[in-house]
Amino acid sequence: VIRILAVIAVIAVHVTADHLDSGSTVAMHVLRSLLSTAVPAFIMISGALNLAPSAMRHGSGRFLGRRLRRLVPATLVWTAFYAGVMGILLTGEPPDWRAEIVDLLTASTYPHLYFLPLILGLTVITPVITAYVGDSGRRAWICGAVAAGWALVVMAVPPLTQGLLQEPLVPLQMGILTYFLPFIGYYVLGRAAWAAPVRRRPALVLLLVAVPALTAATVWAYLSRTTDTPPGQVLLPTYVAPTVMLLSLALVVALMGLGRRWTVTARTERFLRTVGDATFGVFLVHFAILVGLRELGYPEVSVLTVTGLLVLVTLGAFAVSLLGKKVPGLRAIL
């Protein structure tokens, strides 16, 4: 369920991105803050599933073979589609090949494609992490916390040093080979939150106290001029900033703790599993549908029409993904 909600939230982020700025209402920034947890939640759910010992029951070779047979073709095809078709052919402008290559190497060809090298990197190191963590919830919590703390420190160095040195110190250059590194903490903590979930009372405290407080802090970070320039930019909400990271962890850990014992009927479980399995394809195709509707002149003049756009893109993306999974050629890239 969290995976389904997360991908819908990702779509909402991209639909509303052009309608949010510093002049937006506080309510819109509250929504923006909550939506910022979508990608971290998706990564945590992936970690909860992939780092389970049962995922390696046939060996790491089988695990990697199965995952990479899906991820590598999808990465190649969708990068070519968005960078080539959407980014070059449809724009009608002569490409700057040097800029295109730089965008490919830095995973910035399209707003959502960074996720592909990110999840590829996490998949490749999964057997190593699983070998250490095993079925120990305690090890998962410790390993995940260390990795998350490392990410916060490393990503904070550039804004903190920009005003002190002639040039900011950048210890980690984000690119297709390194994008996954700051997200290892989310990945492992997703496993920790499932293998050793917090008890009901702490989970309620997280959900009812920590999440609202951290949401308020994230809204402040969006609106405050403190985050416009270094060193205050260290608090600017990104997936690896203290505000969003703590909010994402509090929300997902609380939901996993509270929802661990929820049960549904077998029919509902089959439905949710089918829809959940389609979320990767939804993530990949939704941006093309969004751009297509905007190119056709879909009006975005009110909250109602923007909400309608969100519904259309979501339904369209799920339809394409679910139907595509029944077509042999498309199944491999969705």
Model-derived regions, located:
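Functionally critical transmembrane alpha-helices in membrane proteins and complexes, commonly lining
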Residues: 1-53, 71-79, 109, 181
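Aromatic-anchored segments of alpha-helical transmembrane domains
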Residues: 8-15, 146-159, 210-224, 288
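Transmembrane alpha-helical segments and their boundary/interface "anchor" motifs
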Residues: 33-41, 53-111, 117, 122, ...
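Membrane-embedded alpha-helical segments of multi-pass membrane proteins
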Residues: 34-45, 108-109, 113-124, 177-188, ...
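Membrane-interface helix-boundary motifs at transmembrane edges
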Residues: 55-65, 129-140, 193-205, 260-270, ...
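Hydrophobic alpha-helical segments with transmembrane-like composition
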Residues: 86-90, 98-164, 173-195
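Alpha-helical transmembrane segments and terminal signal-anchor/GPI-anchor hydrophobic tails
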Residues: 199-268
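C-terminal "closing" transmembrane helix and its immediate cytosolic amphipathic cap
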Residues: 259-272, 287-334
